[in-house]
């Protein structure tokens, strides 16, 4: 009886797990080779390996590709999924209001033209029928195209991409930089380099052309309690900004700064009369629906405008994914008509706080020229190893060489064989000061704490051996005495 019961239980579990009308686990299995074909063989980024230009550059992607494609295909990209993310890179993206609610998952630079230039994005993957989505300074003429995974993928060049190592002759103080809005910051980085040290270079004159047109606000289902706080008693409240004098011929973005959200149950907005008028059944269903409302740990803003739609996601402090982000930029890109009106839909009831809601427009006319100025004196004969980067450069003025690799205290640098100070440039990148002349620069990376860790490990092994050996020696000594 026990054996029959056991066998019957196994059969029932198998049916529940693999049955088509049950869990249907079989449907989750894939044939052998599926992972390889999906992540490598049919990866759109394979088109990059067909390029003649195999120097050091990054690419961005406007097509769907597997997570961590740059790592899988040994190319340099702008997207990655990595839990142990470089904290300085996270700080830079936070300053720039990158529209990503978590620190470890980045999917490109969201077509922000100045960032594509500053990060050395030389190429973009895009479907030939979607070139209208390319950032402004990308050429619409593809330099490479291929049939991959049943679809055509093309590679389009950026006409203003900076090289991996470029020089700045002026610096921006941390105080000046921090006082700027996210779009003004990305604009300013084209005029100089942000350094933590002071007095290394002359102060930069910011020449960017970022404007925030005045907008009239209209509320629908939302109450403004003070200058920064808005209360939505029910789901779906709306804040509409109408721009009287729209700005044309620019890259347009919607900027949110200082966002916070406090959840309240829609039941709180209902009067006793409204609840009493409902049937007991409907009242119980409503109470059940909002029973766990207070557990909400994230919220989003839906954006509706005359030039497109968008979405901004925000994780509250009680979320396991909260990472201190309160500023966000949604880039609408460039369009034939200017942004005239945008509606922010508040999906859930509650208190929303915004230090700033604004539309910002950045003129791109001078971006290419400013990038050309930064890249005029750049690192040549670049060699990039596993833990090193080197090259030669000639400068005509006192400059800071900015290298587009994430900063870490593990980096050291020599200039003409002499150790020099590694600077933290633009919050997240490597830098080194150079005097006029021709120089050989070599950066070397060593994991911070590696030597101390190895020494402690060796000491632990010796101590373990001693703990094992001492009793054995004592035992042997006692035997000899006997």
Regions found by a protein language model. Give the residues of each.
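Active-site-proximal, structured, solvent-exposed surfaces of multi-pass membrane proteins
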Residues: 212-482
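Conserved luminal/periplasmic juxtamembrane motif of membrane-embedded glycan-processing enzymes
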Residues: 1-220, 235-236, 294-310, 315-356, ...
């Amino acid at each position: 009886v026990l054996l029959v019961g056991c066998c019957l239980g196994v059969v029932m579990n198998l049916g529940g797990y693999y049955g088509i009308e049950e869990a249907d686990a079989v449907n989750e299995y894939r044939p052998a080779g599926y992972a390889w074909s999906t992540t490598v063989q049919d990866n759109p980024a394979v088109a990059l390996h067909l390029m003649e230009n195999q120097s050091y550059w990054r690419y961005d992607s406007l097509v769907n590709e597997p997570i961590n494609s740059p790592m899988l295909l040994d190319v340099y990209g702008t997207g990655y999924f990595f839990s142990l993310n470089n904290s300085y890179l996270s700080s830079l993206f936070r300053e720039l209001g990158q529209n990503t609610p978590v620190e470890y998952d980045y999917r490109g630079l969201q077509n922000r033209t100045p960032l594509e230039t500053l990060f050395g994005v030389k190429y973009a993957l895009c479907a030939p029928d979607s070139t209208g989505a390319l950032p402004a300074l990308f050429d619409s003429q593809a330099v490479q195209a291929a049939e991959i995974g049943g679809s055509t993928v093309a590679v389009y060049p950026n006409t203003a991409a900076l090289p991996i190592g470029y020089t700045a002759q002026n610096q921006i103080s941390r105080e000046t930089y921090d006082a700027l809005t996210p779009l003004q910051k990305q604009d300013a980085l084209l005029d100089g380099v942000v350094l933590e040290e002071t007095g290394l270079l002359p102060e930069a004159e910011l020449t960017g052309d970022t404007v925030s047109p005045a907008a009239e606000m209209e509320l629908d289902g939302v109450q403004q309690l003070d200058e920064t706080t808005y209360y939505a008693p029910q789901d779906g409240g709306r804040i509409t900004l109408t721009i009287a004098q729209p700005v044309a011929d620019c890259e347009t973005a919607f900027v949110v700064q200082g966002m916070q959200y406090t959840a309240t149950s829609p039941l709180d907005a209902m009067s006793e009369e409204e609840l009493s008028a409902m049937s007991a059944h409907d009242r119980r269903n409503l109470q059940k629906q909002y029973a766990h409302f207070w557990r909400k740990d994230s919220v989003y803003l839906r954006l509706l405008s005359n030039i497109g739609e968008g979405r901004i996601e925000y994780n509250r402090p009680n979320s396991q994914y909260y990472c201190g982000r309160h500023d966000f930029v949604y880039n609408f890109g460039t369009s034939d008509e200017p942004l005239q009106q945008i509606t922010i839909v508040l999906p859930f009831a509650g208190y929303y706080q915004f230090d700033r809601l604004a539309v910002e427009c950045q003129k791109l006319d001078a971006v290419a020229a400013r990038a050309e100025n930064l890249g005029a004196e750049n690192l040549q004969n670049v060699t990039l190893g596993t833990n090193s980067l080197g090259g030669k450069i000639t400068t005509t003025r006192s400059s800071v060489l900015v290298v587009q690799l994430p900063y870490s205290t593990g980096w050291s640098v020599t200039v003409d064989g002499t150790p020099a100070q590694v600077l933290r440039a633009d919050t997240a990148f490597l830098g080194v000061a150079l005097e006029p002349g021709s120089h050989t620069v070599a950066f070397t990376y060593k994991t911070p704490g590696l030597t101390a860790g190895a020494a402690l490990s060796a000491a632990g092994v010796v101590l373990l051996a001693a703990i094992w050996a001492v009793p054995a020696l004592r035992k042997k000594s006692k035997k000899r005495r006997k």
